[in-house]
Regions:
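Enriched for short, Lys/Arg-rich terminal
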Residues: 73-138
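A short, surface-exposed loop/turn module that caps and links secondary-structure elements
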Residues: 39-67
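N-terminal "first-domain core" detector
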Residues: 1-36
Length: 138
């Protein structure tokens, strides 16, 4: 099985959102849920969720993780290259919770991903102990 572990990237808004959520005790499970969702998965796993564009080779996905009181995550999967680009995440409940993002916000996340890929201004996402680590992509 080809795993995506070494090809998971994110943009600045995703990184900042994780850092902000970690500060709130309500969301202390954020790293564990994301690690469980991301770790040791085949690229086809990342096709699941709500397709926000019509692309089979470059699906832009909205995916709920952690159940009813969990999180909603947006990401782009580039199937042939086996790369995942995490765009944004937000809790569905709690003090920072919201039911959904607007279509305009989702479009902006997508544009930000495309620009970051082109400009190579992404962070590589890895697991360090029990936390996600964001290192600048070279």
């Amino acid at each position: 099985m080809n795993h995506c572990n070494d090809q998971i990237y994110c943009i600045e808004p995703f990184k900042k959102q994780i850092q902000n959520l970690r500060k709130n005790n309500c969301y202390k499970d954020i790293d564990q849920l994301l690690i469980r969702f991301l770790r040791d998965k085949d690229i086809d796993h990342f096709r699941t969720g709500t397709l926000l564009n019509k692309s089979i080779t470059h699906p832009y996905i909205k995916h709920d993780i952690g159940g009813r009181s969990g999180y909603r995550m947006y990401y782009l999967a580039i199937i042939a290259a086996k790369c995942i680009y995490l765009a944004y995440i937000h809790p569905k409940t709690g003090s920072d919770g919201s039911p959904n993002t607007t279509n305009e916000a989702r479009t902006e996340f997508y544009k930000t991903i495309a620009k970051a890929i082109k400009d190579r201004t992404l962070y590589q996402v890895t697991v360090m102990g029990e936390l996600l680590d964001f290192s600048t992509m070279i």
